[in-house]
């Protein structure tokens, strides 16, 4: 296992520890919701950006239940901050939560939780996308994506899907190519 794969595996293990130690999945289940892991942790492509993404489904979605879950999460002394957004009256039809959790090494992990009605337009969509990405990865494309993520400056905010499209769809292999690829999207 090379250096990048080792680092990615360690961070993915830490992310799983955050999920377990925070009790986040059981907290959401306690209010009748179904938490589903999405994003880079689900694809196995979590690198240095400490971010854990969940889509959470309820039928019906009740704002009070969402707040009850977050109140329970906030009781954990490792939770440092929580943000909330109500997007129920938008196309996204969701409640958006962001929590920051300090792990055993006092490293902050951002936990993004999108709470939406079961059966909504996005129900299962991002889970299927993540599973398709994971299914088409080769050793080479996995290593390329991890390297690009590793080489990205911490100040640069790039969505994971950008790396995946660049590498898997468009054949990008280096960070210089990735930067050019991103610039080309602006000029389309």
Question: Across the structure, where does each feature detected by a protein language model lie?
Answer:
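Short amphipathic alpha-helices in soluble, non-transmembrane regions
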Residues: 66-74
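Conserved small/polar residues in nucleotide/adenosyl-binding loops
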Residues: 186-188
């Amino acid at each position: 296992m090379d250096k990048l794969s080792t680092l990615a595996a360690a961070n993915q293990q830490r992310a799983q520890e955050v999920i377990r130690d925070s009790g986040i999945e059981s907290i959401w289940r306690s209010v009748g919701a179904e938490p589903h892991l999405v994003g880079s942790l689900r694809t196995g492509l979590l690198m240095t950006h400490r971010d854990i993404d969940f889509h959470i489904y309820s039928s019906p979605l009740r704002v009070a239940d969402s707040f009850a879950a977050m109140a329970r999460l906030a009781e954990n002394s490792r939770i440092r901050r929580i943000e909330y957004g109500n997007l129920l009256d938008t196309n996204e039809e969701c409640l958006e939560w962001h929590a920051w959790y300090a792990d055993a090494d006092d490293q902050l992990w951002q936990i993004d939780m999108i709470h939406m009605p079961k059966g909504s337009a996005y129900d299962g969509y991002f889970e299927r996308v993540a599973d398709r990405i994971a299914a088409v990865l080769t050793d080479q494309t996995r290593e390329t994506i991890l390297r690009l993520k590793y080489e990205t400056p911490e100040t640069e905010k790039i969505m994971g899907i950008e790396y995946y499209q660049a590498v898997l769809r468009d054949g990008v292999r280096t960070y210089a190519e990735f930067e050019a690829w991103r610039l080309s999207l602006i000029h389309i």
